[in-house]
Amino acid sequence: LLFVTGDLAAQNIHLSTPRTSLVLSAPAGGELKYVYYGSKLTENDCREVYNAPTMQHGAYPVYGMNCPGESALAVTHADGNMTLQMEVAGTEIKNTDGAVTAVIKLKDKVYPFSVNVCYKAYSDVDIIETWTEIAHAEKKNVMLRKFDSAFLPVRRGDVWLSSLYGSWANEGRLVQEPLEPGMKVIKNRDGVRNSHTAHAEVMFSLDGKPQENYGNVIG
């Protein structure tokens, strides 16, 4: 079962796969925020999540007015200003064969600069695809200094990171390590030959060191 619900006043968005749920808050004129991502919720559970005193995180934080943490998007406008302040301009829900796509339209409060944050939830597998679409109508070029395809906060705890690295004749070596405070960067500059070095694919184990047959993971 896959469904999406929307509260016309608050624009709450609930996307589900067979065993997971993603809940977003997208109030018109406000900030797009994550409310919940985890095991599948019923509609009653979803209402309880919105009412619970939980910490909500920005779903696509930008460099600008208030940016104490890492940003997903940073630009230099045509006039040299580096500030972004995005607000929800609207939402669109698209139903296609076997999937529901939610498009949350963000616009800057000052500049003609917009971002569509997109989520596509599938009905037959536990996959929620996410990407962004960036556009502007400024008079000159805008420089994109950072433009991540997605941003997902993970609750602090006994979280482990699994990734692959390698070299010629020694590809696909698995490394598993606890996720510590700070920044972990996995980078590959080898184009289509990325099996020879670090792989961009990662897996987060949310309840301790990864086990073969059980555990909660995000990959």
For each feature predicted by the language model, list its residue ranges.
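Polysaccharide-binding surfaces and accessory modules of carbohydrate-active proteins
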Residues: 11-23, 32-219
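Bacterial Sec-dependent N-terminal signal peptides
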Residues: 1-11
